[in-house]
Amino acid sequence: MGLERAFADEPAFVPYLAAGDPNYEASLEYVEALARGGADVIELGLPFSEPIAEGKTIQNAIVRSLEAGMTPDRFFQFVEDLDVDVPLVCMTYYNLIYQYGEGDSESRSDSENASGETASQGPRPFVEKAAAVGIEGLVVPDLPGEEAGPLRTACDEFDLDLVFIVAPTTKGDRLERMLEQVSGYVYVQARLGVTGAREDVDDATEDSLARLSDWDVPKAVGFGIKTGAHAERIVSAGADGIIVGSALVDIVAEGHENGDSTDAVADRLEAKARELKEGALRGAAERPQPERT
């Protein structure tokens, strides 16, 4: 398990796009543009018909992807077809993970894994396939830490990281259970507070980072980051990385609605990626430097 390596030397830029939005071929180009623009890890959304944890922008992207024919097996082919040299993470929902393989005769077997589940049940077939095509981690927004045992076991077996989303309200025992099982990085869900022309980090974001400070895992902040200035402020406040989805999905949606060429949209995505990565690097330079002894 090695997503932590993306955070080792500098703040990581982690963009998100829904795989297959607005169509298979264009989406390949868009993901590759993000890699050229400086992405350190790329989160690929595997669409699910009931994306309860997503905002309107990403819900619309998921609808476009589903209408274009995206399925789990097509998603895995998509990953294999990508020409990128950065770690890939799959973001999807547990029902889809759990049900994968039920209709695949090659996945059905009377054999059992160490937990006693048959190979045709539970998350194991999905995790095995994800690892085989090159996915290095999973983000599962609807999976509570206390119910993550079977997925954690499968991820351990196939060397995948399991990333949890920590909201400002995630505290106490629930937070402890998540952090005991997380690997790769923590997705810290937070918002930017904007007052007039001044973009700043709200108290909830700083509180979340402070609560996680004793845990030796990278903290990547997402939710509401749209500009290089946002990225700069988040990293200067102590984040190890930034996660950006809606701002990038908006570029895809606008290009699709306007009938822009794939190349034009890819160029805009690459430029936005560079802006965000450069903002994160500026934020790292602004952090207080430890005193030399």
UniProtKB/Swiss-Prot annotation:
Residue runs in coiled coils: none
Gene3D superfamilies, sorted: Aldolase class I (3.20.20.70)
Pathway: Amino-acid biosynthesis; L-tryptophan biosynthesis; L-tryptophan from chorismate: step 5/5
Organism superkingdom: Archaea
Keywords: Amino-acid biosynthesis, Aromatic amino acid biosynthesis, Lyase, Tryptophan biosynthesis
Pfam family, one: Trp_syntA
Gene Ontology CC: one annotated term: cytosol
Gene Ontology terms, MF aspect: tryptophan synthase activity
Spans annotated as Disordered: 103-123
Catalyzed chemical reaction(s): (1S,2R)-1-C-(indol-3-yl)glycerol 3-phosphate + L-serine = D-glyceraldehyde 3-phosphate + L-tryptophan + H2O
EC nos: 4.2.1.20
Function according to Swiss-Prot or TrEMBL: The alpha subunit is responsible for the aldol cleavage of indoleglycerol phosphate to indole and glyceraldehyde 3-phosphate.
Subunit structure as annotated in this protein's UniProt entry: Tetramer of two alpha and two beta chains.
Family designation: Belongs to the TrpA family.
Protein name, as recorded: Tryptophan synthase alpha chain
